[in-house]
Amino acid sequence: MPLHPGLENAFKIAMAKTETDVAKLIAEGLLASPQMYANIALLAIRITGTGLAFRSSIGEHVWRDPSLYLNDEFLQRCNGLMVIMDHPETQVLTTEEFKNRAVGSVLLPYIKGDEVWGIAKIYDQDAISEILEGEVSTSPAVVFDQTAGNITLTTENGEPLLIEGVPFLLDHIAIVTKARGSKGVWDKGGDAAGVLLTNNEVSEND
């Protein structure tokens, strides 16, 4: 006889024995985010959005083709992706910036609607405390070379529109803090929504 869905979910949660098990439950929405596990916080974060967005810092519209990101190949590229606090001034992480900013890595990437999300393992306790205060989002560092196929057009208003191709490097995913305005490009002008904070039982003192 099949189990009642609620009972089946309770069994799944009870049988979670590893950080990967817990990460899968968060991704499925069966556990709230974040979850404290041993010395780490398991946290659902957006790796990238797709479609049309606006980079207000440089006045550029951008189109990120969903077909290039919402697939298994891109998810594989996200495995182990470095999680840092705020972007460095350099386009990619240097040794020094890695030492100063790295706080964890992506354990389990997955597709959520028209976005790519991942469960991150956050080790740095100061970073965990800052994240739990809220008003944070995410911003990916994707790097393009001459073979990427990027095309720049001009909108009717005379503003640049970048049609992105395939990035040759996915360097890191940054947690955008209050000090950097709390929002990422893929919030698309809305509220900061790149970090899922739904677990009211976890406080910065845990």
What are the language-model segments listed below?
Residues M1-E204:
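Signature of dsDNA virion morphogenesis modules
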